[in-house]
Amino acid sequence: MENNSLAPLRVGILGFGGLGQAAARLLAPKQEMKLVAVADRHGYLYDADGIDVDNAVQAYTQQGSVGKAKKGQMSEQSIEDLIGEGEVDGYFLALPNLPNTFMADVTRQFIASGWQGVLVDALKRTSAVEQLITLREDLAQAGITYMTGCGATPGLLTAAAAIASQSFQEIHQVKITFGVGIANWEAYRATIREDIAHMPGYNVDKAQAMTDAEVAALLDQTNGILALEDMEHADDIMLELAGICHRDQVTVGGVVDTRNPKKPLSTHVKITGRTFEGKISSHTFTLGDETSMAANVCGPAFGYLKAGYGLHRQGLKGLFTAADVMPKFVR
């Protein structure tokens, strides 16, 4: 990976559903990053001069793939083909981790390809991050700096918990509660399936196998509300790896409204602990209700990509989490 420090980082996005499209639009006004590559399951698009986001979105929504866009290519091995063609400094893996091994499999593709640079994901499940941990040495040897768990939660709220923990001698509990409002669940099909997988009676395989009609029927039964408790969320292992607390002291739950863009409740993290004076107290960090899921996931992801690029230039390769590194603001 070679990039003049004064030139914008050349960025790719893998996955072009609701999250990937939001990420592309977020990058459009940025000066420090330039979107040059996108891929979906049926095709990819590479343009060293910068991708026309409107054209890419139109091709995806109207023709089913960015491969139909100007300069696009149809491919059933789009990730592999894109890695081989494009000069990209870092990729945001805006991919659904369905099945639960998918992100690790994609990571192995990058390792095997010989590509060097920065990868960032917004993974949710603890078990998915554990799979990446087993690839830590392989990533380092391949010359890849991988930033995992860098969305909203895990990610932004995990980092907030790591900072807030500094006030305490010991941490008693980290409680993350989120509210997500989505006007149209079909724009986030994979994300909703990942959330359904956390519900009682469901798992990743069952949620992945659901048809759109079955998902719609479930949402009809719940009036569009997904109430989630005691989720398997990688905030726990990330804070444990950072030495802040044991994973059993971290709880994550929330409410997703799939029929209303307004958040059903405020997203926040509450950190409770004991100070060195023996006082029990709590810090609470709350996200603004007007900030969308896309803003709170994609913004931190690119902030961590920028931070990861800094690590990469210093020769630091391998796996890092949102609790290990502060994100950098992307101008």
Curated annotation (Swiss-Prot):
Keyword Lipid metabolism applies: no
Pathway where this protein functions: Cofactor biosynthesis; biotin biosynthesis
PTM sites of type Allysine: K124
Sorted UniProt keywords: Aminotransferase, Biotin biosynthesis, NAD, NADP, Nucleotide-binding, Transferase
InterPro entries according to UniProt: BioU-like, Glu/Leu/Phe/Val/Trp_DH_C, NAD(P)-bd_dom_sf
Active site feature: K124, E194, H198
Enzymatic reactions: (8S)-8-amino-7-oxononanoate + L-lysyl-[protein] + CO2 = (S)-2-amino-6-oxohexanoyl-[protein] + (7R,8S)-8-amino-7-(carboxyamino)nonanoate + 2 H(+); (8S)-8-amino-7-oxononanoate + L-lysyl-[protein] + NADPH + H(+) = N(6)-[(2S,3R)-2-amino-8-carboxyoctan-3-yl]-L-lysyl-[protein] + NADP(+) + H2O; N(6)-[(2S,3R)-2-amino-8-carboxyoctan-3-yl]-L-lysyl-[protein] + CO2 + NADP(+) + H2O = (S)-2-amino-6-oxohexanoyl-[protein] + (7R,8S)-8-amino-7-(carboxyamino)nonanoate + NADPH + 3 H(+); (8S)-8-amino-7-oxononanoate + L-lysyl-[protein] + NADH + H(+) = N(6)-[(2S,3R)-2-amino-8-carboxyoctan-3-yl]-L-lysyl-[protein] + NAD(+) + H2O
Disruption phenotype annotation: Loss of biotin biosynthesis.
Any further remark recorded for this protein: In canonical biotin synthesis a pimeloyl-conjugate is transformed into biotin by the subsequent action of BioF, BioA, BioD and BioB. This enzyme replaces BioA and performs the first half-reaction of BioD. In Synechocystis BioD acts on the product of this enzyme.
Domain notes: Has 2 domains; discontinuous domain I (residues 1-149 and 291-331) forms a nucleotide-binding domain while domain II (residues 150-290) binds substrate.
Family classification: Belongs to the BioU family.
Protein name as it appears in the record: (S)-8-amino-7-oxononanoate synthase BioU
